[in-house]
Amino acid sequence: MKVGIIGAMEEEVTLLRDRIENRQTLARAGCEIYTGQLNGIDVALLKSGIGKVAAAMGTTLLLEHCQPDLVINTGSAGGLDSSLKVGDIVVSNEVRYHDADVTAFGYEPGQMAGCPAAFVADEDLIALAENCIQQLKLNAVRGLICSGDAFINGAEPLARIRAAFPTVAAVEMEAAAIGHVCYLFNTPFVVVRAISDVADQASHLSFEEFLVVAAKQSTLMIKAMLTTLAQRG
């Protein structure tokens, strides 16, 4: 088994990359892919860069060059579910774009033409993540994660997203693009991110302060998931 792991930023991948054994690096078009073994599993760790285009391009490179059996998207997110606090975990049941709008042609908010309304995470990977959450005794929410090319900060964009997607649990900038590419490649995926900020008017300050906390928590989750997969054989 080979596991693809995707993080957008240096802070989101460095703790994992530094632990990869027999590490090799592929650099292409602004992306970096690190291959080797981590916690007993063959891995391909992608640092994609920020935003939907970077995430889609990087995920495509990852799937084409490394052919992982599954993909886990790690990193940070802004919490919209009222029960989420900094350091808590959000697990995707599905991902959607919050900044796509072709509703004039009968599509749902966030739905791209010719695509499903949402990209649905793999149930087995969701169960794996939730099992690890219980083992680690972390607070977590399973729900909708919405992505767009904007850092959500302030009442107006928050209200717009909540109005269009009432069940949204968290927002960030890559997960829907990753889910979109995995859907096209028929590769199972799940998003497991830690909360770095509660999306509000001061979220940019919280993000800068707590990104490292979120990175440590999401790394803890990835390592636990890999260990469980290795034990299953």
Swiss-Prot record:
Q: Which UniProt keywords apply?
A: Amino-acid biosynthesis, Hydrolase, Methionine biosynthesis
- Pathway assigned in UniProt: Amino-acid biosynthesis; L-methionine biosynthesis via salvage pathway; S-methyl-5-thio-alpha-D-ribose 1-phosphate from S-methyl-5'-thioadenosine (hydrolase route): step 1/2
Question: For substrate, which residues are the binding ones?
Answer: G78, I152, M173, E174
GO function terms (MF aspect): adenosylhomocysteine nucleosidase activity; methylthioadenosine nucleosidase activity
- Class of the enzyme per the UniProt entry, highest EC level: hydrolase
| Active site location | E12, D197
InterPro entries, alphabetically? MTA_SAH_Nsdase (IPR010049), Nucleoside_phosphorylase_d (IPR000845), Nucleoside_phosphorylase_sf (IPR035994)
Give the UniProt record's GO annotations in the biological process aspect: L-methionine salvage from methylthioadenosine; L-methionine salvage from S-adenosylmethionine; purine deoxyribonucleoside catabolic process
* Catalysed reaction equations from the record: S-adenosyl-L-homocysteine + H2O = S-(5-deoxy-D-ribos-5-yl)-L-homocysteine + adenine; S-methyl-5'-thioadenosine + H2O = 5-(methylsulfanyl)-D-ribose + adenine; 5'-deoxyadenosine + H2O = 5-deoxy-D-ribose + adenine
Q: Which domain of life is it from?
A: Bacteria
Q: Which NCBIfam families match?
A: MTA_SAH-Nsdase, PRK05584.1
The task this protein performs is described as: Catalyzes the irreversible cleavage of the glycosidic bond in both 5'-methylthioadenosine (MTA) and S-adenosylhomocysteine (SAH/AdoHcy) to adenine and the corresponding thioribose, 5'-methylthioribose and S-ribosylhomocysteine, respectively. Also cleaves 5'-deoxyadenosine, a toxic by-product of radical S-adenosylmethionine (SAM) enzymes, into 5-deoxyribose and adenine. Thus, is required for in vivo function of the radical SAM enzymes biotin synthase and lipoic acid synthase, that are inhibited by 5'-deoxyadenosine accumulation.
Q: How does it assemble?
A: Homodimer.
Q: What is this protein called?
A: 5'-methylthioadenosine/S-adenosylhomocysteine nucleosidase
